[in-house]
Amino acid sequence: MAAIEVGRVCIKTLGREAGNTCVIVEVLDKNFVVIDGSVKRRRCNLKHVEPTDKKVDLEKAASTEEVKLALDAAGLL
């Protein structure tokens, strides 16, 4: 399993946004992270995301524009 860290690209597995690509923007605690990308920026339970081996270069609490630019540069959006 890939590490849960800022910049880790994930796939949403549950909810209305299931199947969409997202990036971890902030780690809140052992159960929750803040995600952004092709999904609305929100807090998400780690049980609802599947981390991938891909990672983009982001700082903690990066803006939505920075996240979208990083995903575009990596060819993931």
From Swiss-Prot:
GO CC terms, sorted: cytosolic large ribosomal subunit
Q: Which InterPro entries match?
A: KOW (IPR005824), Rib_uL2_dom2 (IPR014722), Ribosomal_eL14 (IPR039660), Ribosomal_eL14_arc (IPR023651), Translation_prot_SH3-like_sf (IPR008991)
Query: Recorded GO terms, molecular function?
Result: RNA binding; structural constituent of ribosome
Q: Does the keyword Ribonucleoprotein apply?
A: yes
Q: Which UniProt keywords apply?
A: Ribonucleoprotein, Ribosomal protein
Q: Which residues form the signal peptide?
A: none
Which GO BP terms sit in this record? ribosomal large subunit biogenesis; translation
Q: Name one Pfam family in it.
A: KOW
Report the NCBIfam families cross-referenced here. PRK04333.1
Record family assignment: Belongs to the eukaryotic ribosomal protein eL14 family.
Name of the protein: Large ribosomal subunit protein eL14
